[in-house]
């Protein structure tokens, strides 16, 4: 039969690229699970009353090339003015070697958070380098492996200050009046839910205020002034007040480390170490503190430990501080951080080294001195005598200056009374400085750059002598070796080889949705039209961003069944926090601010109780029945007991137990009956899209993990995006922003992220995914994700029983394998199986969540039947190995499972094991071998001997 032109054009071609199993493989799997079709399987699994009758109207699919062309046309509407706005965001030069070999490399961007350190040593080393950069520049003892942005780091610093404060009755937090406005905005939002009073005043007046537990200072103020706070910090410390300092990472190359001046906590943005502005993000924040406060720090911390053979190995340290273990008692709700961006900043420091960084910082400062000298020579007044890269210039004809700047396609900071702000950066040239002279002075100023340079080179007083750094930085060999592109390329490749990412094998982590991050989706993030915009540029310069964000929001509204979407939260945990704040403020608007009880099922992800605690709520746990479902009797009892104090329930759907609960609508109705709101966690949205939706189910608010369902890569632990969808009654209560008015949002609420649209520059990834898949492809993706999970469950059921199933013995898009009976019989644990999978070339499934002693498997729709069968065969082979232990062929203390993973060096070492080398490293005929570089980590040693900076030089010799 002759095909039509429409068929030949094949606008849905990308659907077949994204979905792993082809039609024949899908039919084989359907036969294996006993279903006639994808629709029939979906109909059996998803409760009838929540199935959508018609698919969401998000349009037809587009080819990769058509979608790229369409998005390019949208991006071209953005105007790329030269930005001197500053305020914590500057233009950068990302070294091409890092752009090509990391940012554009799936070996880096498709990896997961390094919970399995044996397959993560490369990015762990890069993160350890990031921590070393932080330690050297801040002068403190302990650093984290990144936070979400500078403003949220400030909020975390405030919370940490209260945790460690000895002034237990003090409840006021002082913020210096010249911190960045977006930082103050986020601090105020967090303080409100914690019940702290925020005082904003001149830093020198801090001692006039009583009952202050913590202080936030900014070393280089928002309008550019360098502050020497040494004496003030000393006085504050004598009064037992915890001092936090916000610092500029490039300025720290030249300026005294705040830690040396007595600061307890130092944080800031690492954006200017090679990460484009991207209309606000994603960017990594750095965070450091004194050693005595290490167990109160937020976020991931990378530590040096030992493996089973005594070799140096890296791991995430002190995880007992974090939400996945401590839940509502965690230091923070942080789950995703900004690993990919931290690693870009880390490698930027490695590539330039201390000499290169000083050259960059000195060049920026020299050009700033030249600009200052020329302006002063012509009679303009600078508001501050001491500065690094930012001038606050008083101008009589401000309107005229701004008009000339606009004509020259220049953005100055314009929100300062009777003055303009000018921040220079590493992209600034002498030609740029001449252009600034023209804008500020007119064309006939007669100034000469070389003449001014000679003047300021010998007589620069813009940095106080006491504020000049007098210690060496980045002395470790890693920062002093890889300065040629050849060396740098090989170093990055050596790190990449140590890790297991999606470019090598499926990553079957339950609750994580490690699906394809298609190349076509990734391409737009490096387009300068998206990468080079300042988040606070005039809105008419960001029309492309606004159009793209509006389209994406409209699609998400239709896919979720909500009425509005807020794009600001820059992680899933931030989305939870923002959604809960919307609920809190909604209740307050109805004079029901007393509603503060949040019901959370026992199976919930750890971020849920941690976020509820951050939002000022009390957590009450609801039991689950023997089938893993929410116990309706217990729910009713807890809701009735809470009564007028019930704020909400946080529920995940499908549940974290991997099933579609039949009573989800009844759960919503019970909570609504008692005046509560329903927060439906979007972690498992990949099993809803096109089939059902949170709004249709009856929820009021959800966050969406764009880094799960909508294809933003995990980046080894970030970036993520967690926009929230809300019903109309909650829309007035989503986050706002103090600097930028968010179009279409009537909210007057505070911000939860530094930038108005969070990590805006990665939103094109999700735009591309939805545009290329269309309604048809999105539904099919959900259906194939369900098929793949049921195929794995059915084939592994006899070897590893599936703990929870729904109607007809089916699972949703993931399944929980119960290892507990095997452990009782044989002594082999879920940990042993997870580590043995490494020898077979696989990342482990999620261990012991949501049930201890289990493995949760989520294959996603992107994995083909060939890869699923390879994983299944590996699991069945491992089961056969367990049977060998059970039969006594191998002793429990010496077998391929408890000794896993095996590394190359073992092949040439003495071999005294009762199994062969071949069984150890080439089990079941593994062909494409992945070699871990370390054996099993010693977690206890790592936490008892905490060491979180680069390993000693001897390790490099």
Swiss-Prot record:
Substrates-to-products reaction catalysed: N(6)-[(R)-lipoyl]-L-lysyl-[glycine-cleavage complex H protein] + glycine + H(+) = N(6)-[(R)-S(8)-aminomethyldihydrolipoyl]-L-lysyl-[glycine-cleavage complex H protein] + CO2
UniProt keyword terms in alphabetical order: Oxidoreductase, Pyridoxal phosphate
Residues where N6-(pyridoxal phosphate)lysine is found: 708
Pfam annotation, one family: GcvP2_C
E.C. number: 1.4.4.2
Induction of expression: By glycine.
A GO term from the CC aspect: cytosol
Alphabetized GO MF terms: glycine binding; glycine dehydrogenase (decarboxylating) activity; identical protein binding; pyridoxal phosphate binding
Cofactor(s) recorded in Swiss-Prot or TrEMBL: pyridoxal 5'-phosphate
Subunit organization: The glycine cleavage system is composed of four proteins: P, T, L and H.
Protein name (Swiss-Prot/TrEMBL): Glycine dehydrogenase (decarboxylating)
Source species taxonomy: Bacteria, Pseudomonadati, Pseudomonadota, Gammaproteobacteria, Enterobacterales
